[in-house]
Amino acid sequence: MEKRLMLAVTISIVLMLVYPLFLAKISPPTIENNMQEDISQQLDNTKVTRTALPKTTTVTADSKRQLPEDAVSTPFSTTRYGLIFSNIGGSIQKIVIKDDKRLDSDLVEDAMFDAGILAIEGDASLRGLSSQSFTITRDTNTLYTEKDGLRVEKTVKFLKDQYGLRASIALTNISQASKPISFQITTASNISSKEAYESRYIEAGTYHRNDKMQRLAGGKLKKSNELKERDIYWLYLKNKYYSIICKPEFDVSGVFTRYVSGNPVIGFIIDDRDIQPGETRTYEFKYYIGPTEIHELEKVDDSFGKALNFGIFTSISMVLLSVLKFFYSIFHNYGVAILLLTCCISVVMFPLTFKSMSSMRKLQELQPKIEKIRAEHKDNPQKLNKEIMEIYRRHKANPMGGCLPMLLQMPIFIALYQTLMRSVELKGANFLWIKDLSMPDAAFHMPFSLPFLGNAINILPILMIGAMILQQKLSQVKAAGGQTDQQKMMSSIMPVMFGFIFYNLPSGLVMYWLTNTLLTSTLQFSLLRKT
């Protein structure tokens, strides 16, 4: 049964660690009643109109264009943002998130030409607009230009005390002839993926009026896609901790994704009726640009909370996150909050854990009898199985009794793993010697690096190895013939393997596993004393 226990735990760990990679290849499962599909799958089943932009105005990964000599970068600063506008294309080139809870973060960098946020590229008078020089007026946060009888004016208004802004695009026909309006506007691009393993969390997607989420991640985000649908409510691009969400205040024709110079670029497709001489047409957008934190998201728009996704067990993760934040509101330290959350989970899971341990203990005590029967009936498999099942029946032991309770706990383990891996609340949070609970604890640094481990000495994974060895010692009972070589090998290898897996994971997650292991060991010790 010890092998079954190790198998169950190993499956749990593998699922938790492989899950982020798995998410990059499939669409996330439902969140409450939300249907979530992959955009690429939708493209296979939906008639899509593809409009290739002119090659002369598109930056590709193979030919990165340089800004002209007359390029001017103009900074705008608020309590929440540091933005840099470029006069070339009249777009946002860089975004720095200001956060009093954690270090400022460079969210977007080097977004130029049609990859610049709010950049427009289209047909007729709008062709080449992403390379056009704009005039920037700081007093009104306005950028404007004129091209082929069309005046284009972009205005940005910042929302007070929120990670939000409103952007408007005003097109005025200053010619004597009507002008066709068909263009693409970039709403998000070049989102940061500097932190270790962060690129696996980069995803884009759309939220629809029928409460449906569509997402695109991993290798599929590197392909050019266009989806012509008019029920799109908003579009997002996010990394592990931060999100850029854009909600149009009008009906769009669809969305597009591109991969420019190694970065994802997303935006809206707008096919509108011709604009008449003297007419002005305005397109309004609401933006959220900030940490993926539910109360900040919902400050800007009630529906933006849908962007917070922890995977298949999001509903459980949201409960765990609420409990974590409740403890933080009392003790003002996320390290303490994680310890208390771990204790709460252990209390809730106690009946299942106790049942699992009791069942395994009973099966271990029956091992001498089972081994004796194996020796007596080794040449008669049918008789052997019958005798073993009779022993289980007589002693009211269930061979699956140790594994099943653990498997029932797996959703909580996976949900908590995702919560501690993705919650921006832990970013920059310290505890004891740990400077950042979203990163390995890195108590010391060596002058050299080890393969796969790096040069940091992480104390928590080492303590976790010791705790797991202690837990295994407590779970062992003396059986006839002692432990098999296989059991001894498992006892030696498993803690080291787990320590290796957890070595560079966030310290908040490792702290949970260490605390949970110690609590489980205490329960095992109490059970051992009673038997």
Model-derived features: positions:
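Short, charged low-complexity linear motifs
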Residues: M1-L5, D70, L221
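Soluble non-transmembrane domains of integral membrane proteins
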Residues: P75-K306
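Helix-loop-helix
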Residues: M1-Q41, F85, I169-A170, T186, ...
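Generic low-polarity alpha-helical segments
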Residues: I26, K64-E69, F76, N141, ...
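Generic N-terminal leader/processing signal
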Residues: M1-E2, N45, T145, V152
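Juxtamembrane extramembrane loops of integral membrane proteins
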Residues: L21-D104
